[in-house]
Design a protein with these regions (language model features):
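Extracytoplasmic beta-strand/coil segments of soluble accessory domains associated
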Residues: 2-45, 63
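Short acidic/polar hinge/loop motifs at secondary-structure boundaries
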Residues: 41-69
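Short strand-turn segments of transmembrane beta-barrel domains in outer membranes
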Residues: 64, 71-74, 82-120, 131, ...
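Transmembrane beta-barrel wall of Gram-negative outer-membrane proteins
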Residues: 106-135, 140-175
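Short beta-strands and strand-coil junctions in structured, solvent-facing domains, enriched
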Residues: 8-10, 31, 43-45, 71-75, ...
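Transmembrane beta-barrel architecture of outer-membrane proteins
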Residues: 18, 52, 79-81, 97, ...
Length: 175
């Protein structure tokens, strides 16, 4: 985000679960000035009436971030900030048949975070999946949270111009 002029991020709850993003002069609160998407699918609660993004994808799984601003963003929705698309990894960047990745963190106030991913390529098929478990008691009263996220995708490259794919996502948060 440091290379995109006028974009700023804001993390409001001390947990890193919900990241707010905005462009210059607009509110970053829950990214409500952006049309927020994941792999092209809208992930805000109500894109036209109440466009807050309560969910932010795990940043370890994000391959790239697509931002469309100005008049071109109108094709994605009415938000003033434009469109923000989190494009998750799909395994096409992994040159091995299988690769396993894990990141685990423990800290004060009962913090525990475990991110585990598997991905790879087998001929014309590439796949990627992850599971993230994040919990803490919080640094203040009533700050407890527990988040579980699972994602998997499988893609088959039929030809250089045609790819067939499947993806499944599950997110559960208690706070």
């Amino acid at each position: 985000m440091a290379k995109v002029p006028g974009i700023h991020t804001w993390e409001s709850d001390g947990s890193g679960i919900q990241i707010g993003m905005a462009t210059r002069g607009l509110s970053p609160n829950r990214s409500w000035e952006f049309n927020v998407r994941q792999n092209g699918y809208d992930i805000s609660s109500d894109p036209f009436g109440y466009p807050e993004a309560y969910y932010t994808p795990q940043l370890q799984a994000v391959q790239r971030l697509q931002i469309v601003r100005g008049a071109g963003a109108l094709q994605y929705g009415p938000q003033f900030g434009g469109m923000l698309n989190f494009i998750l990894r799909d395994g096409s960047d992994i040159q091995k048949s299988i690769e396993l990745e894990t990141q685990n963190t423990a800290g004060s106030f009962g913090l525990f975070n475990s991110y585990t991913a598997i991905g790879g390529q087998l001929n014309k098929v590439h796949y990627y999946g992850f599971y993230d478990h994040r919990q803490a008691d919080g640094w203040r009263e009533n700050g407890r949270y527990k988040v579980r996220t699972g994602f998997t995708t499988v893609n088959y490259q039929v030809s250089p111009k045609l790819k067939l794919g499947f993806e499944l996502m599950r997110w559960n948060m208690r706070s």
